[in-house]
């Protein structure tokens, strides 16, 4: 029989928990939204951090924003109730690591302008990294004495082209590497980067990064695709803008890693993918199964590879419509190993709904245990003829209900 407590007894029990300063117990209290004002005064920084994570009171967040503990700062910034006013207080925190967290997370341009003048360079580094930082601030930071700050400016997709052009003449190799990585770096800058004088090893690394940049000219695409250096061919084969005709050439490369990049590149046409499948190589087939533009016509060939990982990868490829996969389920309904594998790893509602009606109890057990199985399907499975299926379905539904209640409590 459950013992009942009076309100006074419950109050005493909670007060004793607070006094014991047990973080696990206090986390439960704080998560429910209780006693935040009292808990935030604790001398234990872990308990104050718990309040910073769960409170919906902006006044409490403002008070905690002066705390120098980095975990408290992170929890405040991750709290959905954190306002720009709270961020402004954090931006003046005496702990530079707290200020750098603000610089990394905020989207407020006034705060970013303020932190761009911070006395600690690693705070400025985070400002340079933030894509919400205004271009004029990034331009100013591109002249910073620390190459680490200039490197972040060179990486930032919000950096203006004329600023990127200036950084082309930077003496530090790391800044040039960052320029090569930036998806906003123009074709013209990339071509001039190729002319930079560096050590042989550094030049190779720079060229690899350039080969992956989507803004390559047609000439550079051809140059990298024909390079005697396999790492350059491997890099350009992964480029999201490489033309299909060059991928067709690279599909015949003698290096397996080059062909694998061709196999999973979205620009590779059906004919080239079909050619690669003829290799009957497990790794190549796995890469094809991940291709976002995998043609449905190739599915029968892929399934013939008969490897569990490939099967589940295909069924989780979000670009393949359900209508392309449901016939496969129907055709291989009696292949228990295949069906069991799909039931265990699939994240598709339509597939799991179909498999919930499978004759095999082991398949239905796996479906009921799959976190992607729709709630409506689990509700039906509560009445399954198999005790184990019913038990798992009930447990899943209970866990989801608990999770929903916790989410609702946080939103309140």
Predicted regions and their residues:
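Alpha-helical scaffold segments
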Residues: 2-412
